[in-house]
Amino acid sequence: MVYSSCESKEPDSVSASNHLLLNGNDELVEKSHKTGPENNLYSQYEEKVRPCIDLIDSLRALGVEQDLALPAIAVIGDQSSGKSSVLEALSGVALPRGSGIVTRCPLVLKLKKLVNEEDEWKGKVSYRDSEIELSDASQVEKEVSAAQIAIAGEGVGISHELISLEVSSPHVPDLTLIDLPGITRVAVGNQPYDIEYQIKSLIKKYICKQETINLVVVPCNVDIATTEALRMAQEVDPEGDRTIGILTKPDLVDKGTEDKIVDVARNLVFHLKKGYMIVKCRGQQDIQEQLSLAKALQKEQAFFENHAHFRDLLEEGRATIPCLAERLTSELIMHICKTLPLLENQIKESHQKITEELQKYGSDIPEDESGKMFFLIDKIDAFNSDITALIQGEELVVEYECRLFTKMRNEFCRWSAVVEKNFKNGYDAICKQIQLFENQYRGRELPGFVNYKTFETIIKKQVSVLEEPAVDMLHTVTDLVRLAFTDVSETNFNEFFNLHRTAKSKIEDIKLEQEKEAETSIRLHFQMEQIVYCQDQVYRGALQKVREKEAEEEKNRKSNQYFLSSPAPSSDPSIAEIFQHLIAYHQEVGKRISSHIPLIIQFFILRTFGQQLQKSMLQLLQNKDQYDWLLRERSDTSDKRKFLKERLMRLTQARRRLAKFPG
């Protein structure tokens, strides 16, 4: 790691006696000489630091960040704020430089400290499916630029796609940073007109996450209140709980304003809970003079040591790149340890959710014919099982939904009410009909004798009125069953559009066939009802009850609801007698029609319809030439399944790695 005199303020630091400088492939200015207890403490530190960072880096490499936010340090700043210089100083490698937008893709900078001083520098640039191994720090700038062009294209466009730069060296800190494009306010040249919006959207995507520490780079020679990067950080982190300010270019401060910069660095002006650090990196003149990063660190150390105002910040541990490196590593480790339990729960919940979602899309379709046959058998078997559940009234329903049988029973209850209402509402008309028939058709019978023809004619007319309502109920229930069967097809075959279409076609064909048979049976029943018949003992019992009820009402001088508008029974004994017979027969025929019509509908429209559909679906297995056609998926189904499987695999691997983590 990088150490400096800032460590003198922290005697318990494992690096208190070290003065390693970050310098890429340059030689060390001062080498550490760790002995005894210090060396043991350093080893313990390395044992804790590296596994934490490696864990998060490995999760990021798995792509877990596509599903969940991971602990990270995001580096943001306005253009020309010195952001690139800070990253160069930390990593020891030169990153793409130039005017305008240089960072055009988020760059994950993974710094790994090698234990042995003799270990050679190595690097790796990864993006999409490409991995470029680097053996020299001088290759970094070129390869990162090439990666940006490959992702974002030539020009000045930006992309949300990540580039990973891994640097392993004895002279870098254990740290992972995400470098984001510099904020620009005005589009210049051939930049997109909305470049400011694009960049800010990309930055917000990272800094808004609670798992991200925001490293805001601010030049000392500008008014901190006008800094866009700090304003954006404040929007997503109003309390400054996860924001660290990095003050750059202290050598460009106007004379007489140094005290103001010291106040800012001491967190007295624009308060952040994590405070500020101040660094001096290579300027443009240093770069032109080819000042090495190692020499730049020496120059920075000397600058703060000799500066009348800023030397106090150095003594307080608030200044220089080495102090910043140590601070960032410490912050990242604490942040990782703090967020790991939450991350573990999030991964567990996401894993469960994706597993459930993946079940909806089923398994992959086998390639071989035998496998396809068994796959189709399973699909049709599941469909037929659901149809059986519907027939038996045992299907599973979600909250607030009714079973099919419940909906049918409701229709049957309405039918029973229609039958009862038909007879009750007809009593007024019946009285008039009885009088009409008596006046027109009574033959040589004396008054008081019941005319059976009158009774029979009225009964037939009353029953025939119910035929069309019965057929209407048949159509209503048929639609309910058809919709229920279609829903089962959609549930089981939704991803296989040809299979679903075939099932729907069969449902429609069988529905028409069974509906026709049911209607024929219903109309036949009403034809049979034109034969006035009831078992003698049943009819006698019904007639006796009607007479007893009438006698009781007469005795109590109360009018039954049925006789509110009818003439008094005593006014015409013949009419009263026929009326009693009509009521008795209505009661029995009403019971018969109320029960038998629903029975016909259940038999043809539910049971036979379902059974015929099941047989018809099984017949699909006989035509092997159609397997491919029937099992053709929707265009997005296989892609969605593949996407979910990849997510599930990532999260499964993430859970395993978290389980193995010693922390």
From Swiss-Prot:
Family to which this protein belongs: Belongs to the TRAFAC class dynamin-like GTPase superfamily. Dynamin/Fzo/YdjA family.
Keyword field: Acetylation, Antiviral defense, Cytoplasm, Endoplasmic reticulum, GTP-binding, Immunity, Innate immunity, Membrane, Nucleotide-binding, Ubl conjugation
Residue ranges, annotated region (Middle domain): 367-534
Binding residues annotated for GTP, in chain numbering: 77-84, 179-183, 248-251
Protein species of origin: Sus scrofa
Segments for region (Bundle signaling element (BSE)): 342-367
Modified sites of kind N-acetylmethionine: 1
Region (G4 motif): 248-251
Domain GED residues, every copy: 575-663
Keyword Endoplasmic reticulum: yes
Pfam families per the UniProt record, alphabetical: Dynamin_M, Dynamin_N, GED
Protein name: Interferon-induced GTP-binding protein Mx1
Residue stretches making up the Dynamin-type G domain: 67-341
Residue span of region G2 motif: 102-104
GO molecular function: GTP binding; GTPase activity; microtubule binding
Residue ranges crossing the lipid bilayer per the database entry: none
